[in-house]
Swiss-Prot record:
Family annotation (Pfam families): D-Glu_cyclase
Enzyme class: lyase
This protein's UniProt keywords: Lyase
EC identifiers of the protein: 4.2.1.-
Protein name: Putative hydro-lyase cu1581
InterPro entries in UniProt: D-Glu_cyclase, Putative_hydro-lyase, UPF0317
Length: 262
C-alpha cells in the first residue's frame, strides 16, 4: 500500500471509496479509528443494541445513527450509504450481493450501528515492533466462525467470529498488553494457539477475508471480530440488513487514541 493511503485523511479516504475505490482498508489513514457497520430496520434495533451490550468483545458500539440518518461526528459531512468501499446486503438472512454503495436499498427506517474494528489497534502493534502479517503480505485479514456461541438477545444469536494475526511467540505477551488497552475496538485476544480448540478446522480456509502465511516461530492469535453481527444476521434472518464487506471498513474521523485506555 502506498504511503499516500497511510497518510490520507479520513474524509479523503471516504471520498475515494465514494468514487469507486473498493479495497480492504487496513493501513488507511494512520492514527484514525475504523468501524464495522450493521444497518437494520428500526423494528430490530433494540434487540440488536441489546445483543451488542451482551457481547461487548465482538460488538463494541462506537455510535448509533438515528433512523434514516446518513452521517454523524464519526463521518461529518459523509454518507453512510456510499462512504465504505464495499457493502453486503442480506435479505432474510441470505447474502443478496455485494455493492459499491447501498443508496438503492436505503429506507428512512434504517438504523446504522458503528462497531469498533481491530484495524484501529494495528498501528499500535506496529509501533511496538509487532508484525502484522496481512499488512506485510498485502492481504485482507483472515476471519473465522468459531464454535463459541454469543449471548442471545431477543431475536439475535449466532457464533462468535474472530480475526487472526500470527504473532512471534516471543511477542505474544506484548501483543496482549498493547491490544488490551483498546477495549472499544475488541481489546485483548480471546484465544491464543490451537485453532481447533475454538472450532476452526483449517486456517488456510477463512470464512471471510484472505488466508495468510504463518511464518516459522509465529503462533495464531485470535481477536473477537465485528463480522460477528453478520453471522448473527444469517441466524436471525431479519427482512433486510446492510453491512460492510468484511475488511472494507468505515474510516472515521475519530483518533485511535480516543479509544486507548491507560
Amino acid at each position: 500500500m502506498s504511503t499516500s493511503t497511510h497518510e490520507m485523511s479520513p474524509a479523503a479516504a471516504r471520498a475515494a471509496f465514494r468514487e469507486g475505490v473498493a479495497v480492504p482498508t487496513t493501513g488507511y489513514s494512520d492514527g484514525y479509528a475504523q468501524a464495522n457497520l450493521m444497518v437494520l430496520p428500526k423494528e430490530y434495533a433494540f434487540d440488536f443494541l441489546l445483543f451488542a451490550q451482551r457481547n461487548p468483545k465482538p460488538c463494541p458500539i462506537l455510535g448509533v445513527l438515528e433512523p434514516g440518518q446518513l452521517n454523524s461526528e464519526l463521518l461529518p459531512g459523509g454518507d453512510i450509504r456510499t462512504d465504505i468501499p464495499k457493502y453486503r446486503v442480506y435479505r432474510d438472512g441470505e447474502l443478496a450481493g455485494e455493492y459499491p454503495d447501498v443508496t438503492e436499498f436505503w429506507r428512512d427506517d434504517l438504523v446504522s450501528f458503528l462497531i469498533g474494528c481491530s484495524f484501529t489497534f494495528e498501528g499500535a502493534l506496529l509501533d511496538n515492533g509487532i508484525p502484522v502479517a496481512h499488512i506485510e503480505q498485502g492481504r485482507n485479514v483472515p476471519m473465522y466462525k468459531t464454535s463459541i456461541p454469543t449471548a442471545r438477545a431477543g431475536r439475535f444469536h449466532g457464533p462468535l467470529v474472530v480475526s487472526m494475526r500470527p504473532i512471534p511467540a516471543s511477542q505474544i505477551a506484548d501483543a496482549v498488553r498493547v491490544t488490551s488497552r483498546y477495549p472499544a475496538v475488541h481489546g485483548a485476544p480471546v484465544h491464543v494457539g490451537d485453532p481447533a480448540a475454538i472450532g476452526i478446522s483449517d486456517l488456510a480456509s477463512p470464512d471471510y477475508g484472505d488466508a495468510v502465511e504463518i511464518p516459522d516461530g509465529h503462533i495464531p492469535v485470535f481477536w473477537a471480530c465485528g463480522v460477528t453481527p453478520q453471522a448473527a444476521v444469517m441466524e436471525t434472518k431479519p427482512s433486510l440488513a446492510i453491512a460492510h464487506a468484511p475488511g472494507h471498513m468505515l474510516v472515521t474521523d475519530a483518533r485511535d487514541l480516543q479509544y486507548q485506555v491507560p
